[in-house]
Amino acid sequence: YAAAKASYAGTDRNSGEWFGIPENEMPPFGVVNNESDLVYDKLGAYNGGWLSGLAYQSGMIGANQANVNDTYYHSAFAEWDQNNQNWYSDSRPDDVGLDVSESGAIDQYDFSFAPNISNRVFIGATIAVTDLNYRMSSSYFENYLYTDNSMDYLDWGNTLRVDGTGYSFNLGVIVRPADYLRLGVAYNSPIWYKMTDSYWGYADTHNENYPEDPDVSGETPASPYPYTNYKLRTADKWIFSVAGIIGQTALISLDYELGNYKYMKLSDPYGYEHYEALNHDLIQKDFGLPHTSKLGAEVKITPQFAVRAGANWRTSPMKKEFREGAFEVFPAVTVAHYTLDKGTISYSVGLGYRFTPNFYMDLACVYRQYKEDAYTFSKVIIEDNNGLHALVDSEAIGLKTNTTQVALTLGYKF
């Protein structure tokens, strides 16, 4: 993957032409110093240059020194065929592993206003301030076992920090045309974020093909960690709801949400889109209109005691071709792995008890199933006069995450 990204960096998708990263512009092989830091700064001008640069610096890939006409980069891991005095053309790792640790939070502070018109029309407006933080660290390895019982290996690690602050607004109206019926519509605006990403990557290899220097390592600049400031406009959505009251004991509700990921936007800290057409085209091609349906019901067993149940179905915001791995994905900096959302289903049950007209307690249990496909690296696809070509293929790892959460709420109504 890294060799292909280095060989075909800077691909012009319109003309079908590309150029690779010149070897003399790669970070110094096996050297970690201020000079290599400066080289990484230059690599920022290339598509995927940092990842390929780290792979070269740590000895994972290299140029073919025996053939000056070969302008491509190749994997440094291959087994020597003693009988034919040549390298085996296909050398694949015997053991591969990826460990990913993630944490984060989204905190939202709401300022709301809600007038009531004749107890028939209810209007709500909210201005929200959102703080976001995300932390990711990952470690990837490949082990190569050879017929002489020797073993080569590579290790690849990354750390990514994402921080952001944004604002948004929400508007909603609920109409009660009859005592037993509620109709609602709401609009949730995009969140306009100011974001900062900081990142660091390292890699090391052990390769007996180079017995004079089998252990090589490299890392991206670390003092301070490189960072990128940018702006992000997220998706907005519309919400439509209907609720019916059955006598004095039951209520049933249905909500439908329509998100709009097609008009998300990335820009620099000043709001300029340096690759406006490319960003717009990729977002339009990869993302669509996800749907969320919610169904809920509540039954009062006694005037004080109620039982609740609900379900939530959410489709992926990614278009079918994208989430099935048909397109190349461009991860951040030296991070090669990523996941593609395939939808969420959740079910909930709850109990509610009102001790007094003002004091109440709720107990809820939510079961959630989230599906996604994980990739250790993306396909590498180029386009020329003969059409699209996949230089590197990548297989998905299907993941299914099941969680159960229990929440106890105590409330007092003033």
Residue ranges and their predicted role:
Residues 1-414:
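Outer-membrane beta-barrel porins/channels
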